A protein has these predicted regions:
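FIC/Doc superfamily catalytic core
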Residues: 1-144, 148-219
Length: 219
């Protein structure tokens, strides 16, 4: 929740995110005021991750992808905009990084084709997921929140396919965006960034496993 929202511009710190998760409170004494949507989208991210785990045995579908978006954007200022279409595909054209994305009237067809391509893959690898993610972000199916939805899908599909999951933290942010931007010319940059993030995530797992084992020894 912290990393994915952080690279999208959330001003919540890691400690603040942990505080919200553990206490469900939003008061931060003697600290900078935080936009309400940052709070809402962070708490929504916790719910979205629970949904991710609850549906982990189901094949990826447009229904699941749309539900990620609905959960993430419910209660935000965007949800009050009549054109925003929370939990469904965009009604207005948008762009990412100065590049045009899929036209609204073409999104449903393009998402169907993307889903069919992905489900036809017999051996999903980190390369498959990189291509899926790039295609998804090129379509940019939602009015906003595409990056967060796309990264939740990446994490989910890593778990489903026995691949080390990862999060794109602030240190990987620029490499990640460059990898998406240059994917047509070279797939290696995005894949390499994802693999680097996997190494970080694996080191977290090892650290917490060691802490857990040390705790059990003390007990």
């Amino acid at each position: 929740a912290y990393n994915s929202n952080r690279i999208e511009g959330s001003r919540l710190t890691e400690d603040q995110t942990r505080y919200i998760f553990e206490t469900r409170l939003i008061g931060f004494k003697d600290q900078e005021a935080v936009p309400v949507d940052d709070i809402i989208e962070t708490t929504n991210h916790f719910v979205a991750f629970d949904f991710l785990l609850d549906t982990i045995d189901e094949p990826l579908s447009e229904t699941i992808i749309k539900e990620f978006h609905r959960i993430l954007k419910t209660g935000t200022a965007d949800a009050l905009k009549p054109y925003f279409n929370v939990g469904d595909y965009k009604k207005m054209a948008n762009e990412v990084g100065g590049k045009e994305t899929c036209k609204p009237n073409e999104v449903a067809n393009e998402m169907q084709k993307l889903g069919e391509w992905y489900l036809s893959q017999t051996n999903v690898s980190i390369y498959t997921l990189a291509e899926y993610h790039w295609r998804f972000e090129c379509i940019h199916p939602f009015q906003d929140g595409n990056g967060r939805v796309g990264r939740l899908v990446l994490f989910r599909e890593c778990l489903r396919n026995g691949i080390m999951p990862f999060v794109i933290d602030n240190e990987h942010k620029l490499f990640y965006y460059r990898g998406l931007y240059e994917f047509e010319q070279t797939t290696g940059f995005l894949v390499g960034t994802m693999q680097s993030a996997q190494d970080v995530y694996e080191s977290w797992i090892k650290y917490f496993n060691e802490e857990l084992l040390d705790g059990l020894k003390i007990d």
